[in-house]
């Protein structure tokens, strides 16, 4: 490996070789970020898929009866996707969201998981997922980005019409306010975070323009830091209407995927159709948010692979890189593009004498560290503490927890599990992973003597 240091002009020349990304080319909005400017569809337009809509709307009641949801889904015809869906991306997203909800309900209903999805779900789910460039199960996109509606489209506030009091979910597993709130806090998070994209591109344009005095770079960094601070506060709003025990015992089991699920009787994952292949996928997770990974790219935060944190148990696999596969194709491609041209941290390290620049960048890192501290606090309250409690609870009594690695087939949610072993819905060990992300964020601030030999 060549350890020769790269001079400032060389760094800038290297990144100038490729144009900066244009948000709209990647289905990203300057006003709403990774949320579409158009609201998600609340129903498919064709009556052909009316049964899908009826079942997903009725999931909260169907899941109250043993195997009821499975018997209803098993009675469905296998439907092909027609032009009403194939010709409109919002129809595709709606179909994908519906099928993801039904798939997870079918697998995890009644506490004893099934390892085969019926053809009536498997075939259209595989097709919609392939077209959208996402895995065939419920993801952050289907649960959050494409699963909300506004209650008053005329209501305009600081965040347009997407304030928490003006949005609600389209579908949930449990019908609880807690589950809706869990998704909606992330919707608002994404809306606030749209400013991060604009500030980041402002900084990169200023660096390329050779802005003397770095005024625009500093201004962009200050705006970015202020927005990350707002994101931290938005995250803590989870506590307002989502109870930890309701989340952990009633909601979270349905969010699990089929990775690391041998203890639940899914050693090969789930088979898609009676004649299909077994596939292994991680469940819906905030690690699948393109916004969070955008912040890391902009600020130059590097995350290392760790076998204990990977959902695949492979030290060569970086969990956050893995999660890019769960994002909509265009958003994933945006991250790759941004990563190839982003040189903010390098630029700051080359201008160590500019105190205002150093302080502005340092504040961004400090705010991102606080955000990750808050995330650890939320995870502790909503996952670690309930997992260590003796309370038994679920949408049904004696329901197994698919997200506890030591749960046995004859057991139930109530036994004690060590916090370091607690597995996230994405299949990774939560606290070690989150603390590593936080520590790697802090380490990013140390740039004083970088690139000096």
From Swiss-Prot:
Keywords: Dioxygenase, Heme, Iron, Metal-binding, Oxidoreductase. The keyword Kinase does not apply. It catalyses: D-tryptophan + O2 = N-formyl-D-kynurenine; L-tryptophan + O2 = N-formyl-L-kynurenine. It comes from the Eukaryota. Gene3D superfamilies: 1.20.58.480. Pathway: Cofactor biosynthesis; NAD(+) biosynthesis. Present with 149 molecules/cell in log phase SD medium. Catalyzes the first step in tryptophan catabolism in order to supply de novo nicotinamide adenine dinucleotide (NAD(+)) via the kynurenine pathway. Plays a role in the cellular response to telomere uncapping. Belongs to the indoleamine 2,3-dioxygenase family. This is Indoleamine 2,3-dioxygenase. It comes from Saccharomyces cerevisiae (strain ATCC 204508 / S288c) (Baker's yeast). The gene is BNA2.
